[in-house]
Structure formats: C-alpha cells, structure tokens
A protein has these predicted regions:
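Covalent nucleotidyltransferase
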Residues: 1-221
Length: 221
C-alpha cells in the first residue's frame, strides 16, 4: 500500500490514485454499512492516522487545513467517520485513532493483532518522511478516486456480497456461509421481531466462531 502510493507520488502523473470499487448498504442518516471494501478502508484509515501522528511530531500543531481534513476523513469531535467490525472497533479507536492504548496487551483476535501491526508498521516507515513528503502522500490519498455501488435493502446487499468479486480480498468460505444464513433469514422470515432476533443470534454466534479460530491460529503460530 505505502509503496504503491509512494510510486504514484513520484510518478507525477496527472491522473488520480485509484482505490478500487466499494459496495455499500445505505442505512439512512448518512450512515453506510460496508459490504465489500472493509479491509481497504481500514488500511486507509490506519494510514491516515499514522500520517497525522508523524505530522504532529514534526510540527507540534496542525494547520487549519490539516484539522479540516482530519475531521473529514477520520474524526471530528466524538464523531468517527469510519468504524471497523464490532469486536475490533474499540481496539481500533483506542490504539489507532485516539492513541490512548499504547501496548499490545489484551489483543483477542488475529484481526486486532493485524490492526496493531499495520499501524505500527506505518508509524515506523513514516519516521523517514519530512513534513513536505507527508503532505504530498496525504494529498494523493485525499484526491484519490474510487467507484461505488450502494443498495438500500439488506437482503440485496448480502446477496451482492456473496457474488461480488473485485480488487479487494475475496470473502472467506466462513463469511459466505454467514451471508447465506442472513440472506435466507431475510428471504423467509416474515416476522420483523423474529427476523431481528435471528440476525442478532447469527452474528453473535459467528463472532464467537471468528474469535475461536483466531485463538487457534494464534496457538499454531
């Protein structure tokens, strides 16, 4: 990711950097669930946070433009522009965004370990950048383009997730199985209360499965 961006900046091309295609579900009130592209958006947010950490180290304070961009891209007040999956989100905010957690204790999942490792990697690599270089690469991120498709119905979103295949990481078999369960609940469950209860149960059970797999992978490593 960083190498690609650096190559783009050094190429001085007139075209914008391309982040790929994203699939969203419109949840209303200007909130969108990410159906496809979660991993890329997580990486982008981690990278921007690492840039701002380095900028603060160099300059001591942010310019008005930097403050505006940070509020637009990452966080303004107590409003977060991006959230990752529920079971990783608190760690994501504490370690990456707010920087109130500075150790690696209590990491429960492999995905949490990857979040911490990615942030630490970017912080380490960006130590070699001066303020001008940081702004150059931040500008490339801010002006990057992407294509998007947005759906309003969760059942359609789940169905599209199952069959979507683009530049992002291909869903695992477990993720597809979970999506199939959710899709069938939407398809065949007529009671809204029962539907909500079943969806919550499926998500909770799969969260437990993900954590169990993560612990097993950690023991193997």
């Amino acid at each position: 990711f960083l190498v690609d961006l650096q190559d783009y900046v050094e190429s001085h091309t007139a075209s914008s950097y391309y982040f790929g295609h994203f699939l969203f579900e419109d949840k209303g009130s200007r909130n969108f669930a990410i159906i496809d592209g979660q991993q890329r958006l997580t990486t982008i947010t981690i990278f921007i946070s690492a840039i701002y950490r380095r900028l603060e180290e160099l300059a001591g304070a942010f310019s008005e433009d930097d403050i505006f961009l940070y509020g637009t891209l990452v966080k303004v007040g107590q409003t977060y522009r991006f959230s990752t999956v529920d079971y990783d989100n608190q760690l994501f905010r504490d370690y990456v965004i707010n920087k109130v957690k500075t150790d690696r204790n209590g990491l429960e999942t492999e995905s949490q370990k990857r979040i911490v490792a990615a942030y630490d990697y970017f912080v380490s690599q960006l130590n070699a950048y001066d303020e001008e270089s940081l702004h150059d690469i931040l500008e490339a991120v801010v002006n990057a383009t992407c294509t998007t498709h947005t759906v309003k119905d969760e059942a359609e979103a789940i169905q599209m997730f199952i069959f979507q295949n683009n530049r992002g990481k291909k869903p695992s078999n477990l993720e597809i199985i979970k999506a199939q369960f959710l899709y069938n609940i939407h398809l065949y469950c007529t009671s809204e209360d029962e539907k909500a209860e079943l969806i919550s149960e499926v998500k909770n059970r799969f969260e437990h499965i993900y954590k169990s797999i993560s612990k097993i992978e950690g023991n193997i490593d």
